[in-house]
Amino acid sequence: MTKKYNIAVIGATGNVGRETLNILAERNFPVNKIYAIASDNSIGREISYGEKILKISSLTNLNFDDIDIAFFCAGSEVSKEFVPKATASSCVVIDKSSLFRVDNQVPLIVPEVNLSTLTEFNTKNIIANPNCIVIPLAVALKPLDNEIKIKRVVISTYQSVSGAGKAGMDELYDQTKSKYVFGENDPKKFPKQITFNLFPHIGDLNKDGYTSEEAKIAFELNKIMGNHFKASVTSVRVPVFIGHSISVNIEFNDKMDANIAEEILQDADGIVTISNNNDLAYISPVEVVGEDAVYVSRIRNDVSKPNAINLWITCDNLRKGAALNSVQIAEELINNYL
């Protein structure tokens, strides 16, 4: 008989929390009891879990002794307060905030890339889920790096508003509607107007001119892939509801070209490649909504530098960029560790 587990999803009413519930149901995760947890103003509300309906309950009343795996999807402040309470019991935490990603005692996992480091989870009973840009980046870069070591990468990200939560999606919707009706926009969640606009500003601006998002991406990518190459990052918020895209230039230490890269990526887990065989041979964000794969297109040589290529990477940031990755981690936990 298959063992079943008690699961808690903290932040269940948010974008990532809802998607986590959806994916747990879709993938038939062996659940005994599942708890949908959210803020006090959501208590008693109903939320879907596959064909079932769950009632939202309170985090303060949750007994972590009854929970095997807790998915924290509610941001760093909630994680800071409640993850220690969870790990004081036998509960394993998969945290989707940035809080524990820099902790050397907490594994930062992308299953297709560095699953072997999951053995370190029981040091603190915490596993960190990476940034929603870092996950597809690592999935695409790792098979190439396995073949020929990467020397450096230059990354430009085009990040949808859902990466900023429900409030980000609401602001894009409200601003778009207001622009037509009233001809005005009042930014609240974002630093500038997001409708019909984009801006290279995600997170706080550091003294070196990079934003905190750009610094996170560079740090996390190197932690996951082994700290042997440099990454320069520019992060751009774009008026797209769901789906992150990445333009990346990769320089290698030895011979690499677009044809070799495409062959490598075609054989890699979790990737769908699109060949340059017509004018529409690329994937846009709207086409990946609801998809689990990381899509790689526009694979081409860098004509300005030998042993360098360019890629266009796109994925659903709420699925593989967040919820799916965490559920894949949980699947590995129950298959080999719990």
UniProtKB/Swiss-Prot annotation:
Q: What InterPro entries does the database record attribute to this sequence?
A: Asp_semialdehyde_DH, Asp_semialdehyde_DH_beta, NAD(P)-bd_dom_sf, Semialdehyde_DH_NAD-bd, Semialdhyde_DH_dimer_dom
- Annotated binding of phosphate, by residue: R101, K216
Q: Where does NADP(+) bind?
A: T13, G14, N15, V16, N41, S42, S162, G163, P187, N317
- The entry's substrate-binding residues are Q159, R237
Which pathway is recorded for this entry?
A: Amino-acid biosynthesis; L-lysine biosynthesis via DAP pathway; (S)-tetrahydrodipicolinate from L-aspartate: step 2/4; Amino-acid biosynthesis; L-methionine biosynthesis via de novo pathway; L-homoserine from L-aspartate: step 2/3; Amino-acid biosynthesis; L-threonine biosynthesis; L-threonine from L-aspartate: step 2/5
What's the superkingdom here? Bacteria
The EC code for this enzyme is: 1.2.1.11
Provide the active-site residues from the annotation: C132, H244
Catalytic reaction annotation: L-aspartate 4-semialdehyde + phosphate + NADP(+) = 4-phospho-L-aspartate + NADPH + H(+)
Q: Fetch the SUPFAM superfamilies from UniProt.
A: Glyceraldehyde-3-phosphate dehydrogenase-like, C-terminal domain (SSF55347), NAD(P)-binding Rossmann-fold domains (SSF51735)
What family does this belong to?
A: Belongs to the aspartate-semialdehyde dehydrogenase family.
The name this protein goes by in its record: Aspartate-semialdehyde dehydrogenase
The source organism is Rickettsia felis (strain ATCC VR-1525 / URRWXCal2)
**Gene encoding this chain?**
asd
